[in-house]
From Swiss-Prot:
This is Gamma-glutamyl phosphate reductase. GO terms for biological process: L-proline biosynthetic process. InterPro entries: Ald_DH/histidinol_DH (IPR016161), Ald_DH_C (IPR016163), Ald_DH_N (IPR016162), Aldehyde_DH_dom (IPR015590), G-glutamylP_reductase_CS (IPR020593), Glu-5-SA_DH (IPR012134), GPR_dom (IPR000965). It comes from Streptococcus agalactiae serotype V (strain ATCC BAA-611 / 2603 V/R). The keyword Ubl conjugation does not apply. It catalyses: L-glutamate 5-semialdehyde + phosphate + NADP(+) = L-glutamyl 5-phosphate + NADPH + H(+). Belongs to the gamma-glutamyl phosphate reductase family. Pathway: Amino-acid biosynthesis; L-proline biosynthesis; L-glutamate 5-semialdehyde from L-glutamate: step 2/2. It is found in: Cytoplasm. Keywords: Amino-acid biosynthesis, Cytoplasm, NADP, Oxidoreductase, Proline biosynthesis. CDD domains: ALDH_F18-19_ProA-GPR. Catalyzes the NADPH-dependent reduction of L-glutamate 5-phosphate into L-glutamate 5-semialdehyde and phosphate. The product spontaneously undergoes cyclization to form 1-pyrroline-5-carboxylate. GO terms for molecular function: glutamate-5-semialdehyde dehydrogenase activity; NADP binding.
Length: 417
């Protein structure tokens, strides 16, 4: 058997046991894990430091290194996230609908686990813990394949998960880490249809596209955030500038950070001037990659290429497009959007409603930063990712997104005539 076949077989077996765990047992184990992760802080930080040194040696940008880096506060935040998942209502066994049909059959539609989840993700090591917590709470086994940049951190965290399961008398193979980070093994995981029920990629555009093209397992597409903010001619310009600065600069390396700015021509001069003024006042610097009209109005700008409009920069860089009309803004955003999060800043209620209806994205904002697209903020607890597709799940994926449904039919001897 191949390495992936062994992992898959182990996961399939473990999925049978975790599916039967009571809510109380799952919550107790999750709380044990949270305590154990905090207790293992020094070990985890030591391993994380190895990843950080390696990343710097490989010339990875400081913004991307920040995604990788852990500290005591971030480890405590990881533990707090586990506690929050433990406190959430368990969807497994929840009755979605129930009725008695004309034949006297009692039909219940219940939430059940998906089975075995595989996740391929990039640098952030906290993803491994979030993914396990949600998968475990919903009675699923999970196979984690993180990026090579975080292999030491992920190994330390998964070892803690497996030890917690073993110490509580449960199968540690409920969670497994693919320790071989080669592309060959990743592609083998994408073909493991006999063992894996769903594959969730979380990372950049290249990773997502590779998984979509090569996976034979059903895929839930997540992550890529080519996010836009449209400044309408009826916008409060001061509020608009504050929102853009927050959405771009608070944490530019995350998928809900704004990447594209679309501005109505009627207020472009005043707004862009206000934006640059407020950036200077807040000691922030953003490189604007602008179209011809915006280029004449901005101080810190270079001419945009066509590819810039479709790029998730994950940096202090932002594309700028000036449009002649509200309708052109919607058309532009729908052309370049990755269907993650989009926003309009306007005091025109009719335009706000039309924008929310017509823009094709999982989350559409009016007069607010796109940085709020997050499982915790939406009240879902931790998230396994933000789905940018329409089938099965869309937007931040919490517990319910990791379940399926099953019909339970009870009769008293009925046969079909």
């Amino acid at each position: 058997m191949t390495y992936i076949e062994i992992l898959g077989q182990n996961a399939k077996k473990a999925s049978q046991s975790v599916a039967r765990l009571s809510t109380a047992s799952k919550n107790e184990i999750l709380r044990d894990l949270a305590r154990n992760i905090v207790a293992d802080t020094e070990t985890i930080l030591t391993e994380n430091a190895r990843d950080v040194v390696k990343a710097k040696d490989n010339g990875i940008s400081e913004i991307m290194v920040d995604r990788l880096r852990l500290n005591k506060d971030r480890i405590q935040a990881i533990a707090n996230g586990i506690y929050q998942v433990a406190d959430l209502a368990d969807p497994i066994g929840q009755v979605v609908s129930g009725y008695t049909n004309l034949d006297g059959l009692k039909i219940l539609k219940k939430r059940v686990p998906l089975g075995v989840i595989a996740m391929i993700f990039e640098s952030r090591p906290n993803v491994s813990v979030d993914a396990f917590s949600l998968a475990f709470k919903t009675g699923n086994a999970i196979i984690l394949r993180g990026g090579k940049d975080a292999i030491f951190s992920n190994t330390a965290l998964v070892n803690c998960m497996r030890q917690t399961l073993q110490d509580t008398g449960h199968n540690p193979d409920i969670v497994q880490l693919v320790e071989d980070t080669s592309h060959v093994v990743a592609e083998e995981l994408m073909q493991a249809t006999d063992y894996v029920d769903v594959l969730i990629p979380r990372g950049g555009a290249k990773l997502i596209q590779t998984v979509k093209e090569k996976s034979k397992i059903p895929v839930i597409e997540t992550g890529v955030g080519n996010v836009h903010i449209y400044i309408d001619e009826f916008a409060d310009l001061d509020m608009a500038a504050k929102i853009v600065i927050n959405a771009k600069t608070q944490r530019p390396s995350v998928c809900n950070a704004a990447e594209g700015l679309v501005v109505h021509q009627a207020i472009a001069k005043g707004f862009l001037s206000q934006l640059e003024k407020m950036l200077k006042e807040s000691n922030q610097s953003v490189e604007f990659r602008a179209d011809e009209e915006a280029l004449q109005l901005l101080e810190n700008a270079v001419a945009a290429s066509e590819s810039d409009y479709a790029t998730e920069f994950l940096d202090y860089i932002m594309s700028v497009k000036v449009v002649d009309s509200f309708e052109q803004a919607i058309s532009w955003i729908n052309k370049y959007s990755s269907h993650h999060s989009e926003a309009i800043i306007t005091n025109n209620i009719s335009r706000a409603e039309i924008f929310q209806d017509m823009v094709d994205a999982a989350a559409v904002y009016v007069n607010a930063s796109t940085r709020f697209t997050d499982g915790f903020v939406f009240g879902l607890g931790a998230e396994i990712g933000i789905s940018t597709q329409k089938l099965h799940a869309r937007g931040p994926m919490g517990l319910e997104a990791l379940t399926s449904t099953k019909y339970y039919i009870n009769g008293t001897g009925q046969v079909r005539e």
